[in-house]
């Protein structure tokens, strides 16, 4: 039986409990336990980058981690992955800060990681690469003679050609991506956007609906919407509340709660969300004194100016809205720029009447799925969800909104707050069925199954790939 080798920018420490490690870690660990294998990634530490890989083995899984130099981390991770790819893939070209040294560092680190992984590989290993930090990784492995089956999953959106082709290195990235055997995306829109970008650059031959050839390289594309662990989340959400939260719930027994939790990121649409809530207060004054909107948004990448700007904007907007609409004994908006324990959040989800998830662009958004899974099926809350979140393709019984239309979001919030119990139960049941069916294990099992079905490349095909190119005709 072939081993599974997983490569991601960061790895979850082997002593970290799966429940607190996040969705990706749960899925990866499930796949690794089933097949046995290796999880390879950055340790999270800088310095001593020349020291040997740190290896830890537990059961049939080996964790192999490495350090990066300060320069490598800055250029590969901060300056290119997060200052070029992240904003571009989330349709924010205005925030892209392309610098040629950062691009060189991005390629250099991917090559370095390929060098580090190469001695660990076995001939029949199946290799699964994750996310935008590692777009060129298969290309580097192929250059080193690796013919194994290599799959790639993109956790964030893939932009349309108008966006992607604005990147100075878009052509190189596209050709490098074709060195993967299987390219997985969150949604059909993402998959088609990738193929559109490719078709604009070179001739793409499609043998079947999702099997393609470009530059003489054969690959497949497929959609794998990532899921969650609904049973684990329901378990975390149930049970007694911590004393302080129980006291707060008792104090707010006549107040309906709108709740939201996101990383502080410009892709999440937080300023637009605040303005939509203000529109609710303005257009539907009957809710005054009877609702409360709590936004939890812990800082991420706090040293980046764009993130600092959002934080200051939210602080100002929260103060302005509370000053305008607040009353003695009633604060309409609570904004908390801090981290909360995941298990506590699931309990808060359960006692929230409305879950507000309105990113401007998101690959999937697991918070939306977690909110649904955390609800009491007999008395569930209502999910208000952005049409630009990948989850909207599955959670069609949510109230789907355009996050740029504050009046539409305000109307959806009013509808959610006044929705009948029967409709709430019906909508929740439909969404929960989808979430249970497409859980995190289903996601990884489908991807691995499809990757296993691909015939490994031969040395001869590798040589053909190097010489056979088919430029797009004018």
Swiss-Prot record:
User: What's a Pfam family in this record?
Assistant: Glyco_transf_20
Matches recorded under InterPro entries: Glyco_trans_20, Trehalose_OtsA
Which residues does the record give as UDP-alpha-D-glucose binding sites?
22-23, 263, 268, 340, 366-370
Enzyme Commission number(s) of this protein = 2.4.1.15
User: Under which main EC class is this enzyme filed?
Assistant: transferase
Q: Name one GO biological process term.
A: trehalose biosynthetic process
GO terms (molecular function) for this protein are: alpha,alpha-trehalose-phosphate synthase (UDP-forming) activity
**Could you say which protein family the record assigns here?**
Belongs to the glycosyltransferase 20 family.
Report the protein name in the record: Trehalose-6-phosphate synthase
The source organism is Escherichia coli (strain K12)
Q: What is the lineage of its organism?
A: Bacteria, Pseudomonadati, Pseudomonadota, Gammaproteobacteria, Enterobacterales
């Amino acid at each position: 039986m072939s081993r599974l080798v997983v490569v991601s920018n960061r790895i979850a420490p082997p002593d970290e409990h799966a429940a607190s490690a996040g969705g990706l870690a749960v899925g990866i660990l499930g796949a690794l336990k089933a097949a046995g294998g290796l999880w390879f990634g950055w340790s999270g530490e800088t310095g001593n980058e020349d020291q040997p890989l740190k290896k830890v083995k537990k059961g049939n899984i080996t964790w192999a981690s490495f350090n990066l130099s300060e320069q490598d981390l800055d250029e590969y991770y901060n300056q290119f992955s997060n200052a070029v790819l992240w904003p571009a893939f989330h349709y924010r070209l205005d925030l892209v800060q392309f610098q040629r040294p950062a691009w060189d560092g991005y390629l250099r680190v991917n090559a370095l990681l390929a060098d580090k992984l190469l001695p660990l590989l076995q001939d029949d290993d199946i290799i699964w690469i994750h996310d935008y930090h590692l777009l060129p990784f298969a290309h580097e492995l192929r250059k080193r003679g690796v013919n194994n089956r290599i799959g790639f999953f993109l956790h964030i959106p893939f932009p349309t050609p108008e966006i992607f082709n604005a990147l100075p290195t878009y052509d190189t990235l596209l050709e490098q991506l074709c060195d993967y055997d299987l390219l997985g995306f969150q949604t059909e829109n993402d998959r088609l956007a990738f193929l559109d970008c490719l078709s604009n650059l070179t001739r793409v031959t499609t043998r079947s609906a999702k099997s393609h050839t470009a530059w003489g390289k054969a690959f497949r594309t497929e959609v794998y919407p990532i899921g969650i662990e609904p049973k684990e989340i329901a378990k975390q959400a149930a049970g007694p509340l911590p004393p302080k939260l129980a006291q707060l719930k008792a104090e707010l027994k006549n107040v309906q709660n709108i709740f939201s939790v996101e990383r502080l990121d410009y892709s999440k649409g937080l300023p637009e969300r605040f303005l939509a809530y203000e529109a609710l207060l303005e257009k539907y004054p009957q809710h005054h004194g009877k609702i409360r909107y709590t936004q939890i948004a812990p800082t991420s990448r706090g040293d980046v100016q764009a993130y600092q700007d959002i934080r200051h904007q939210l602080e100002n907007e929260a103060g302005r809205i509370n000053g305008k609409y607040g009353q003695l004994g009633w604060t309409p908006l609570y904004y908390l720029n801090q981290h909360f324990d995941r298990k506590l959040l699931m309990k808060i989800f359960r006692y929230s009447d409305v879950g507000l998830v309105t990113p401007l662009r998101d690959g999937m958004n697991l918070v939306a799925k977690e909110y649904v899974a955390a609800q009491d099926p007999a008395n569930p809350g209502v999910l208000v969800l952005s049409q630009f979140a990948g989850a909207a393709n599955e959670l069609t019984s949510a109230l789907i909104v355009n996050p740029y239309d504050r009046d539409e979001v305000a109307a959806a919030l009013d509808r959610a707050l006044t929705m009948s119990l029967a409709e709430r139960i019906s909508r929740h049941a439909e969404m929960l069925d989808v979430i249970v069916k497409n859980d995190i294990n289903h996601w990884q099992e489908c991807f691995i199954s499809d990757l296993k079905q691909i015939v490994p490349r031969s040395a001869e095909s590798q040589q053909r790939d190097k010489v056979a190119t088919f430029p797009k005709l004018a």
